[in-house]
Design a protein with these regions (language model features):
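Phosphate-handling substructures
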Residues: 1-48
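Generic beta-sheet signal
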Residues: 62-72
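Helix-loop module immediately N-terminal to the HCX5R catalytic loop
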Residues: 47-55
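Acidic, low-complexity terminal tails and accessory targeting/binding regions
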Residues: 1-15, 55-64, 77-135
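A structural signal for well-ordered alpha-helical segments within the folded catalytic domains
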Residues: 40, 44-48, 72-77, 98-99
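Short amphipathic alpha-helical molecular recognition features
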Residues: 34, 41, 66-67, 93
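Short, intrinsically disordered low-complexity segments
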Residues: 22, 44, 75, 126-129
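Homeobox/homeodomain signature
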Residues: 21-23, 68, 75, 86
Length: 135
């Protein structure tokens, strides 16, 4: 379920660069690659995964720690969904570096998870007239 976004059928490096520019101008979350997926498709998979994880967390025999290994977009969408971030907040999140750990840790005092390894922000990312909240 943590499969990265399908980028469709790219023929040339120049085409890839053009599509990346369009995606950045349009917004990473909603842009759909020709013959591929939008960030919303990956978000839906993450949402399904979280439903399963929440059920697993309720089991007494479930381990205290959970490790997810995936790609940068899926990581950012997981963080977006977990913390109920807006699309604008998601689009300002920079991609983690290759091999970077992104750690969510339970705060025993509050009972809430915290992002203890924050992702860098890009304040120049796409801005919308008002934030869009999905949940």
């Amino acid at each position: 379920r943590l499969r990265e976004q399908e980028w469709g059928y790219l023929r040339t490096y120049a085409e890839l660069q053009q599509l990346k520019k369009e995606r950045r101008d349009y917004g990473i979350f909603y842009y759909r690659f020709p013959g591929g997926e939008a960030g919303t498709d990956v978000y839906d998979r993450i949402n399904d995964l979280l439903g399963s994880l929440h059920r697993d967390f309720l089991r007494e025999d479930y381990p205290q720690n959970c490790v997810l290994i995936t790609h940068s977009l899926a990581i950012r969408l997981f963080v977006m969904r977990w913390f109920h971030l807006t699309v604008e907040e998601f689009e300002q999140m920079c991609s983690p570096k290759n091999g970077q750990l992104v750690i969510l840790q339970l705060n025993d005092a509050t009972g809430d998870y915290e992002l203890v390894t924050p992702l860098e922000k890009d304040e120049t990312a796409v801005r919308r007239s008002r934030p869009i909240r999905l949940h």
